[in-house]
Amino acid sequence: MNELKLIIATPQKKLPPLTCDSVRLMLCDDAKGRGGGEYGIHPGHIKALMALQEGPLHAFLHGEPILEGACGAGFASVEGNTVTVVVESFQKK
């Protein structure tokens, strides 16, 4: 089974990379208020760059949550099976 590498960075810290098989986070709406909301990323996802709004971030491995937290606004990128999240803040729950 393919896995993702999740990297979370804030201006104050960079968390150690985490191995997971899915990530859920909150996307910003576009200028007309469309398209935002919860978004899921799985292995094999296409290359992407996304604007994030404040909200929850969840990472799962084999269907079990392994990381739950609250993100500040920022960006997420997907390249290969690496998800990089750069946000104003991140607080584990």
Identify the residue ranges that each predicted region occupies.
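Short structural boundary motif marking the start of a folded domain
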Residues: 2-6
